[in-house]
């Protein structure tokens, strides 16, 4: 595994993610510019819990993107959102397993058989996270897609199916965290993208709809929070990261008081 530190009570495919501060932060390395990718790896890797390599970087460079991130990261999150027939996804998981990543995403919509095949292929060496409802989908869009009951109902359903089929956790928007954590206690992991630090508005090109602050996501049950655009292209990444750390520490202090 790519982990530099671990939890003695955790499974082999788990990294230590508890506590306040930046251990629970996943930085999304979403770029196809190599200089930016390498710079982000070097800066964020030693400072946060996990680096995430997604489709943009992986399609551009393939496994070398993982190797670049691993040189700096405590843990690696490969975000490919695999979604195909069970045999094909199982083969892809076996290939990803050899890349020495800690987390790998699949789509919950692939169904129990696909998730179970992926879990068997993972063989405890990578934590499978089932993606539920993507954060750019708002309620009107879900209605147009003929998904009755809205995002919360579907996320809860898919999370239950994913856990029963062997997934280590799910990816969901911050808005579903509280209900999902009540229904699915730890060690089942909840990973929340759509994180916007306090004071960071939705800028031009921000296509995520179901969002929340980092502190709110942690307070309502997230184990990991995924942040990309508020951090990586920031004019002063160090200041942006310090502000995020302060937000999380203030929230943790308030929870203790």
Protein language model annotation of sequence segments:
Residues 2-39, 178, 182-185, 204, ...:
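N-terminal amphipathic alpha-helix/helix-capping segment at the start of soluble metabolic enzymes
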Residues 21-22, 84-169, 173-178, 183-191, ...:
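Conserved anion-binding
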Residues 26, 49-52, 77, 105, ...:
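Conserved beta-strand positions in the central sheet of alpha/beta enzyme cores
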Residues 27, 51, 81, 104, ...:
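Conserved, mostly hydrophobic/aromatic
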Residues 32-43, 86-94, 151-160, 208-216:
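Short, acidic/polar
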Residues 46, 99, 165, 220-221:
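Structural motif
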Residues 101-112, 207-240:
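Glycine-rich phosphate-binding active-site loops on the catalytic face of alpha/beta enzymes
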Residues 115-119, 231-256:
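C-terminal helical cap(s) of enzyme catalytic domains, especially alpha/beta-barrels
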